[in-house]
Curated annotation (Swiss-Prot):
Cellular localization per UniProt: Virion; Host cytoplasm
Function as written in the Swiss-Prot or TrEMBL entry: Encapsidates the viral RNA genome by forming a left-handed helical nucleocapsid that protects the RNA from nucleases. RNA replication depends on the availability of soluble nucleoprotein. The encapsidated genomic RNA is termed the NC and serves as template for transcription and replication. Together with the phosphoprotein, sequesters host NF-kappa-B in inclusion bodies (IBs) thereby inhibiting this host defense pathway. May also act as a modulator of the innate immune response by sequestration of host IFIH1/MDA5 and MAVS into IBs.
Residues where Phosphotyrosine is found: 38
The species this protein was found in: Human respiratory syncytial virus B (strain 18537)
UniProt main location, coarse: virion
UniProt superkingdom: Viruses
GO MF: protein serine/threonine kinase inhibitor activity; RNA binding
Gene: N
Family: Belongs to the paramyxoviruses nucleocapsid family.
Protein name listed in UniProt: Nucleoprotein
Source species taxonomy: Viruses, Riboviria, Orthornavirae, Negarnaviricota, Haploviricotina
Key words, A-Z: Capsid protein, Helical capsid protein, Host cytoplasm, Host-virus interaction, Inhibition of host innate immune response by virus, Inhibition of host interferon signaling pathway by virus, Inhibition of host MAVS by virus, Inhibition of host MDA5 by virus, Inhibition of host NF-kappa-B by virus, Inhibition of host PKR by virus, Inhibition of host RLR pathway by virus, Interferon antiviral system evasion, Phosphoprotein, Ribonucleoprotein, RNA-binding, Viral immunoevasion, Viral nucleoprotein, Virion
């Protein structure tokens, strides 16, 4: 698709139409939604930790538990507000800790469980029982279990949410094609944590988050706001720092990118879907200004439904002008700019980034659905080596 066929005016007209609507809709989150408060945060963190210490853990419910932990960090009131602001009709279920009795091998045992509508007491107890087996094995191996290997280490919940941060912007693909990239990145950035916990299996945890976000789209809104709040909070643990880096890179710079309002998906990394044959910086400035008008998360929620309208502005994030606009500029290598840029700083940032991409030679063209002419033009412009171009 040549860029000349994508008219910015088309997007502006749609924006005017949408802005003129006098009505709103209410979406349903289902019968009840669990909204844990700060007081159960420690228990949810421990539940995450139990999954992490369990060898060959079943991660079917890990995504859900991770999201409940994220909500407990936001707090009940803010979680409900986020959902209502996103147009959801919320029937909130308060979450408390209660005692649950279960017969195990003829002996009645007591367990502390949460009053969750989304996760039965039996499932919570089973998670604890399985984790105890692994903990006993760990005791035999280590003699004494160091704090960072225990299920109640304070960073357990955030370790799991690091994988959610990798999954979140892959959702625009509409399938799980980004799973391989998520696993590779998780294995790299969480390598120390993987050494600590045998149950930290990126593939299984990522699939669990995919499942949760696909079945409960309202949790996407919650997670995005949680990610922004968490990343903007100073201090915190090493894992919180990793989370902020992953979230801001994935959401701020984008593994789902601008291509003049047409969606381009990442197969490799942020240096990808920006091979545009007819890019001109005048259009980049227009796109940038329009994106500023739309605001922080504009477009993110609508990518699946309306790619052209989703400029994925992300102007609140520090990497926006240097990264996203470099991408939107078609690398600034695909076409020459004729005339004086209206925004010299913007032009320089995009140009510098484009040159860096060209020099590194790691652009992936396979995701762009290019015509034969466009592909030929790219080859002519970049003179890439055969291995640098994925077709």
């Amino acid at each position: 698709m040549a860029l000349s066929k994508v008219k910015l005016n088309d997007t502006l007209n749609k924006d005017q139409l949408l802005s003129s609507s006098k009505y709103t809709i209410q979406r349903s989150t289902g019968d009840n939604i669990d909204t844990p408060n700060y007081d159960v945060q420690k228990h949810l963190n421990k539940l995450c930790g139990m999954l992490l210490i369990t060898e060959d853990a079943n991660h079917k419910f890990t995504g859900l538990i991770g999201m409940l932990y994220a909500m407990s960090r936001l707090g009940r009131e803010d979680t409900i507000k986020i959902l209502k602001d996103a147009g959801y009709h919320v029937k909130a279920n308060g979450v408390d800790i209660t005692t649950y009795r279960q017969d195990i091998n003829g002996k009645e045992m007591k367990f502390e469980v949460l009053t969750l509508s989304s996760l039965t007491s039996e499932i919570q107890v089973n998670i604890e029982i399985e984790s105890r087996k692994s903990y006993k094995k760990l005791l035999k191996e280590m003699g004494e279990v160091a704090p960072e290997y225990r299920h109640d280490s304070p960073d357990c919940g955030m370790i799991i949410l690091c994988i959610a941060a990798l999954v979140i912007t892959k959702l625009a693909a509409g399938d799980r094609s980004g799973l391989t990239a998520v696993i590779r990145r998780a294995n790299n950035v969480l390598k120390n944590e993987i050494k600590r916990y045998k149950g930290l299996i990126p593939k299984d945890i990522a699939n669990s988050f995919y499942e949760v976000f696909e079945k409960h789209p309202h949790l996407i809104d919650v997670f995005v706001h949680f990610g922004i709040a968490q990343s903007s909070t100073r201090g915190g643990s090493r894992v919180e720092g990793i989370f902020a880096g992953l979230f801001m890179n994935a959401y701020g710079s984008g593994q789902v990118m601008l291509r003049w309002g047409v969606l381009a998906k990442s197969v490799k990394n942020i240096m990808l879907g920006h091979a545009s044959v007819q890019a001109e910086m005048e259009q980049v400035v227009e796109v940038y200004e329009y994106a500023q008008k739309l605001g922080g998360e504009a477009g993110f929620y609508h990518i699946l439904n309306n790619p052209k309208a989703s400029l994925l502005s992300l102007t609140q994030f520090p990497n926006f002008s240097s990264v996203v606009l470099g991408n939107a500029a078609g690398l600034g290598i695909m076409g020459e700019y004729r005339g004086t840029p209206r925004n010299q700083d913007l032009y320089d940032a995009a140009k510098a980034y484009a040159e860096q991409l060209k020099e590194n030679g790691v652009i992936n063209y396979s995701v762009l659905d290019l015509t034969a002419e466009e592909l030929e033009a790219i080859k002519h412009q970049l003179n890439p080596k055969e291995d640098d171009v994925e077709l």
